[in-house]
């Protein structure tokens, strides 16, 4: 990945773009400890783990495809005599047939074939019992469909469109304890429940009912007493009671009972008798409640026996079954209540002692004991049958069926898996030390869950918070693709099992057993139509990055919009540093779709973690550690802006920190960690908003979302006031071209850059590396915006690995540039900025500041129809010459033609159905072969409302069909482009080769050679210069070593030429081979139109602080308010938009922007006066010295570089004010002072129309404004006549259908109220659904007769038909 390590260079070297234009950083914090991580890491890393493409088969880890295969294979036949084993897999032997760009053009999926090595083992049936003898082993590679590959930028190309698979935030597998918040029962009693959620398999729920009995549900079915599942696990009543209760031991006397006393257990009870110590002193009086003080006294007196009356035992529960030792009969069952009669029986059978359950309202409730009484089952089999009846109602249970069903529910690895995450979470929650174990449940697991649940009901322990990020995990692309793949494999498994059981399995090969269709169908379905596989948002680089970093709680296995409550959507304390609290959509999805914070990443288990700096003994170290939400709770974590001295010691006595999810103050010695950066808590989009800390959260949310909708302008301009994130975003998004290796620029033109790579970067000494970068020119993005790259380097420039060589859309010298810096004034202007309207100057239109290019794609498909093939041709029936003027002889529009709505782009005719011909016509056709009458014109035309220039045409023809002139022409042009690249590469390499040869040959003694080179003469440079290069190899030298090197060079020379020819041949074959088109398609023509959209009233604009508005009018430059020096402002905003919305950041940005522009102006004046590099260096130093930290090193630049830098700063000195660490009021004032501007940030303005000064000074400055992708051109729509609905005959609605305006019920009332009868009649008849009337009307207008006679509206006929359908005969009576 070129981008992945683009920023791994040491910070000492200044990158090429930074030398051209560096930002003044006003952040207060010292140098960033942790560089911003590669922003697309989540996607790329996840998919890399899934494919494990470049890892040898035996070294692959247990995840992704490998894990899916291992979990399904080996597949054994029902008899057990044949086994299909999985050995390994490989992805795409050669490189994929088409690269990403070609796949996009041809509408293909960018994928690699998956070949799996399988082994079929057949065992001998005749072998003696108990021994397995192998009869035959066959190994074979089986093709299992195509697996989509990820592009370098983390997207996938599916059917020619770029898509992104959004990560999902779902509930982690494991066990969760919760209560119903008192909503279930009218009393408001809290009912506790436990739920075991597996990664796949049945859910297991335990719950209390209002009577405190425990119940179990499997897969949310009908509930059963919880003890049924314990019995099904093989426990009997006594064991169950033993697991949940302690017992009290009683000795039976003739009249009384003696209790073996454990004093603690008396707490809270009423004393039935007086309790005395050995001396007879009363400790507790009768009928008093026993308190903790009493218990201490009892323990002190060492009383361990207590004689109690019989009635103390009544109502207590027997803990162990009591058996008559003589007869062996059962006197009392476990869990039976003691009555007077039972005691009498016990004494009669001479039972000496008994155990009762220790049940106490305070710490040990009778829940399990009560549940056992509800449980009708008595043994394991009955319990299994009961469970079977719930899961399979209506089926007769058998012992085997019941046992296998229960076994498969929770204990079979095929049907149930907790996964490593689930097991870790489960063990942690039930308090076990080891964090690994089986993926299925065990008896102990189920018992432990019940134990914890009972403890929580008894008040020991807390319920879980399901919105805690320790209980929600991220599922990324790789994991979701793996799950889909497994689903496909399981479908294959069933088919393979059946085939393995066939008699002739010995003659089959693995290929015959495996059908790859279900697997590729599952993968295709996932990438093509899953809710989480989305059409990539490609408005601008930021929207791409944000889309790839998005985290959604929706999707399969997630929440639904309707069911998600307030808690799930809310910001949670654990979001800190993991998920952005600001960036989320407005509307129904708010809070369900989030964005990863800048530094967040998912750990091995899929939980989000965020980095912190370690603090040891009050000293902040440079060591960083990633903590997940679970680990974070136990530490004191200080904020990033905590005061620290030079040695890194914490200075303050009390430090604001976070502990257990609360914000608190504590002493410095308790602090364990500290935030890495102030922008740690926000996402990429929010981190691009300067002065975010001064904006209200709601507006910041809008600001983050609107930056993603900015359309790339023709001339991007980086913001004067940024945050320092701009470069990172531009580089990581992959829209710029980045140097793969260091080197020198060899040649540059608008569409490609050739770099001669530095020697140290090439693997081979002889080989001189050449990197050729082809730039993307005017390509259409998913949102129809324009992707265009242009170089920023010049020939001879030295570039380092990772430097930006060419800017893409919305980037300016390697920095993100979504909009334009405009001179803004906050003031009202004749009501034109009422309610967020925006007033702009005509200058913005003149200078094309917000002109954008949109590229529309039109596709024309010629198919084989039943009546014959459609034909693409310029011979179209009933079309005038003028309409065909822009087409070539093949019927396809010329490149460069300017077309308007309704113009033909591709001429196409379709055969018409045979019409009944008269005998005369038949004769004529037989004689002349006249065919024109039976085709109809189905040409591709430009849709209404679009005018533009044709910039590209692509033609795809089916194999075996003759290509037309135009296709051959396009192929020829493409080929010459490839040839030029290969020739350039060859030229650079050959130049280097001959350069080395010249060094080798010059001054050597020759042994003969061409051009009469005598033996023994020295070779000179002039001799070599006159000799054609090819002939250098004919020179013979006396030195053997040198001769060998010359021969080696000759070989290398030949090799270079051969490689070039082979590559050219390969490209030619790729270009000329026919397209793989859908069945029935003969030819596809794609025409690309570039539409230039200037800014105009009705377009939506916005700043970065959520300050959005619509342009109300464009005012001539001379009428705009102007400053004292005559500069007219560019844009006028309403000052009332600031106070109520509380986004003050825009005002601070305006002031700082003005200062930045003012400094730039001063530098510009110096350059105009002819200042040299020394003077410029002197004046730039104080500006760059404003940076407290991360200071830009001017000394590292050479003089010419200083001059270039100063020239680039004329438009304004770019400043970065990082989020939550921005410029202070004092700094802004200081900068304004340096720029010789008023420190109030306000200036006197003059009215452009009258020349008079306005009464008050106005806040003026530079603000960064964006043009959003809500353009009035896309919304404007007008219709004369068009398509009508079939049933009602009324015009369709909406722009896409070329529909009309709805004239609804209320509009009718309005006309009725005015008594406008004729207008109303016209609206409801001829303008709508009076079919005959509207045809007559059209005819009348054409004849110049403007009368109207309305007939019967079609909707009346529909009404008549509907009434008739109710069997009521209704009809119109004609007088």
Curated annotation (Swiss-Prot):
Function (record text): DNA-dependent RNA polymerase catalyzes the transcription of DNA into RNA using the four ribonucleoside triphosphates as substrates.
NCBIfam families recorded: PRK00405.1, rpoB
Subunit structure, interactors included: The RNAP catalytic core consists of 2 alpha, 1 beta, 1 beta' and 1 omega subunit. When a sigma factor is associated with the core the holoenzyme is formed, which can initiate transcription.
Family statement: Belongs to the RNA polymerase beta chain family.
Record's keyword terms, sorted: DNA-directed RNA polymerase, Nucleotidyltransferase, Transcription, Transferase
Protein name listed in UniProt: DNA-directed RNA polymerase subunit beta
EC category name: transferase
Pfam families, per database record: RNA_pol_Rpb2_1, RNA_pol_Rpb2_2, RNA_pol_Rpb2_3, RNA_pol_Rpb2_45, RNA_pol_Rpb2_6, RNA_pol_Rpb2_7
The species this protein was found in: Coxiella burnetii (strain RSA 493 / Nine Mile phase I)
The keyword Glycoprotein is annotated on this UniProt entry: no
SUPFAM superfamilies named in the record: beta and beta-prime subunits of DNA dependent RNA-polymerase (SSF64484)
Catalytic reaction(s) noted: RNA(n) + a ribonucleoside 5'-triphosphate = RNA(n+1) + diphosphate
Superkingdom of source: Bacteria
BP GO terms, sorted: DNA-templated transcription
Keyword Protease assigned: no
Coiled-coil region: none
A single Gene Ontology CC term: DNA-directed RNA polymerase complex
Any one GO MF annotation of this record: DNA-directed RNA polymerase activity
